[in-house]
Amino acid sequence: MNKNSLAFALLALILTSPILSLPAYAADTQSEHSSVRQKVVIQVSDNDPKKWNLALNNAENVQEDIGKNKVDIEIVAYGPGLPILKLDSPVGSRVADAIASGIKVVACENTMRKTKLTKGDMLPNLHYVKSGVPEIMY
């Protein structure tokens, strides 16, 4: 083997060795964090039943894939997305099912105040926060 071939082989080995160890690293990292409770926040700011159904589907899928006991899921509604949480909501039964399965559904009180909605206008068992966007941030 000449010097160029040897240098090339050595360089290839150096460059690929970190890549070859990635699957082992990923497995170690995954097993390390498997006992850590995950947190997911889904924001909905559209008054569109299709988008709400998508958000609810995503939340349910996360619960199924990760496990209800391993993840905290919160759906935060504000702005135009808030009225879908009213008592006459076309997705009210799905929201109720999500809440019953442990998904926290949160309504923005700023939006409620600006749209003159009260807690009496809203679906039961919702959580409330002063402002929706900061809730997503934390």
Q: PLM features: what roles do these ranges have?
A:
Residues 9-21:
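Bacterial N-terminal signal peptides
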Residues 1, 22-25:
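Intrinsic disorder/low-complexity signature
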Residues 5, 14, 77-79:
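Contiguous hydrophobic segments
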Residues 1-10:
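Bacterial N-terminal signal peptides that target proteins for export
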Residues 24-138:
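Secreted/extracellular ectodomain signature
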